[in-house]
Amino acid sequence: MKESPLITLVKRHSETHFANIKYGYYVLIISLVYLIGLALLRAFGRRTPSRSSSAFKNKIIYRLYDIDPAIHLGILFFAVLIPFYYHYSLTTQSTVYLKRLGRLSYALIPLNLFLTLRPNWFLRKNCTYTDFIPFHKWFSRIITVIGLLHGIFFIIKWAIDDNVSLKQKLILKTFNFAGFIISILVLFLLICSIGPMRRYNYRLFYIVHNLVNVAFILLTPIHSRPGVKFPFLLLNCTLLFIHIINRIVFAKSLMILNKNANYSKTNLVHVRLPRAILPDYFEPGSHIRISPYRRINPLYWLLPSHPYTIASLAEDNSIDLIIKETSTAEPGSQIESLRSNPKSFHLDQEKTYTLINSYPPSVPEECYSQGTNIAIICGGSGISFALPLFRHFFNKENVKYLKMIWLIKDYSEYELVLDYLKTNGLTFEKKLSNNKRISVFISGEYTAETRLDEITTNIDDENSEYEMGSFNNEDEDLSISNFNSENADSNDNTPETSHSPTKENGSMIEVKSKHSFTLSNELKSFNNESAQVNQNETWLFSCGPPSLLQLSKKYCNDERINFVCETYGL
């Protein structure tokens, strides 16, 4: 009787095939720990700069609380990369680490999707989605670069291996071809996300960003071996579904009640919306996002919505926006051309829009309840953020000092806001106090007789597609250097003028032209008061061009003062 031949079973996969599964779970656990730590940081952390601590320590504390990308991404990736190189040889088992790069990029997507939820109910009390915009930008870039490196390294590995056919590996195998498609899409996204490209055509970037993200989430499970369907695909699809639901459930139709744009030399406009579109209460400085398309229109999902800071308070009868429209004017042209750009987004009375939702500002709760020594500094259309804050603190009896400084290029911008105050019956005279005041600084010259007849000579194009807020490139021309901030004793040949041109608020609002502006001089009383009160009672708000934000932030760091800013950017 013949013995049956010995049958040898060969493993389909090498011993390293499943080496990265546990690492993927580890990344997911680190993401969860980071979220818990972030919630605790915002709930119990201290953003207040201690007067007894060094400037360096205060800076680190502030950057940590403020979700600075460099600090937070450094902490996150330090934890994630600790076990990245472990057990397997980098020279003889390099495939393990190349695959690990791919799994790392996909395992980080749930965290990225979670932090961009609008609203984010887990972090809603102590965070807003705008807090995560800088973090999201850099986190997304790192994720895409890691995924792209995974693909590039495998292509190089196959290309230099004489025993491997690159065509067979890359094209003829479905799972690898799916990965190749992902790499091409990710590369295109990275090109579109470069600053100049993104600013030149934000709509293109936004469309590519969303489509590539969806493709990355859905194609990676086809490409990945071992699979990533559970839990990663399930988590990613669930979070995507929540994003979609948020844009459906909270959205509502709206029409413009009124639009005031009848001014001779500014593209600053006042838009009035129905009060019913928002809940009974919203915090001062909140903002809304508006889409020109209905929810059933595919463009509602493909194109970006437009954010606008609410200039009203919750008790007002309407929702008011003070915004700047996109400029296409050449020097010396008429103001009507400011609103003729077909690429821009304008709110018109005859159209129906979709309000996606309203969102709270990035202002700590203790500021509203404890603040008694307040300074607000804004530039251009940043007045939409500053004005409701000023009104909120002006109406509080316990506020000891309140000053708002508004830097603008032209008197016509002030006229529009003044008209807005008159139209809404807003007068500050009934609670007049020497410690409550508005100062308006105008960088250009004007006289009361000729200011309305002058034609603007320096209007830059703006991009209305900014990720947050109604401040835009138009205001970037409002440089602090135009106000001689670097030299308080500058001997300018242009005479300074200072007067209060209104009857209703004549003693309250002071308008200054060609006035030497220095933050320290304007805030002497504010700084003196800060030494007399509890540290949690002193707050400085800033909203405007980068130079203004940097100046305000430096002032607060030097003086150990709480700082809140509204930042806009693509």
Swiss-Prot record:
This is Probable metalloreductase AIM14. Its EC number is 1.16.1.-. It is a multi-pass membrane protein. It is found in: Membrane. Residues 480-509 are annotated as: Disordered. One of its GO terms (cellular component) is endoplasmic reticulum. CDD domains: NOX_Duox_like_FAD_NADP. Keywords: Electron transport, FAD, Flavoprotein, Ion transport, Membrane, NADP, Oxidoreductase, Transmembrane, Transmembrane helix, Transport. Interacts with ribosomes. Residues 1-20, 91-141, 198-373 are extracellular. Residues 480-505 have a biased composition (Polar residues). Residues 250-388 form the FAD-binding FR-type domain. Its main location: membrane. Probable cell surface metalloreductase. May be involved in iron or copper homeostasis. InterPro entries: FAD-bd_8, Fe3_Rdtase_TM_dom, Fe_red_NAD-bd_6, FNR_nucleotide-bd, RBOH/FRE. It comes from Saccharomyces cerevisiae (strain ATCC 204508 / S288c) (Baker's yeast). Residues 42-69, 163-176, 395-570 are cytoplasmic. GO terms for biological process: apoptotic process; reductive iron assimilation; regulation of actin cytoskeleton organization.
